[in-house]
C-alpha cells in the first residue's frame, strides 16, 4: 500500500536531486514508481521483475545519478560506502572508512 508521506519524500528527493538509497526489497518501490527506468539498479534476488525498466546487474550495489540500491543485509557495508561516496562527492571515501573499521571486507 502506498504511503503518502513516503511518496512525498521520494518526489521531493527526485525534484531536488537529493539522494535516494534503497536496500533489499525496497528498490522495488522505486521501480514500481518508474524511477529506475534506464538506471542501474539491484535488489534482493527474486524482486527483479519489479525494477521496471532498470539496467539490472548482479553487483552488490548500483549507483545511478541520485539513486543508490543494494541487494540486502550482506551488502550493507558496501551500500553504506556508496552512500558516503555520494555524500562526500569523493569516490573511495566510503571504502576508506570501512577498511579503517578493520573489517575484512572485499569490495566488488
What is the predicted role of each segment?
Residues 1-108:
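Active-site-adjacent pocket-lining segments in enzyme domains
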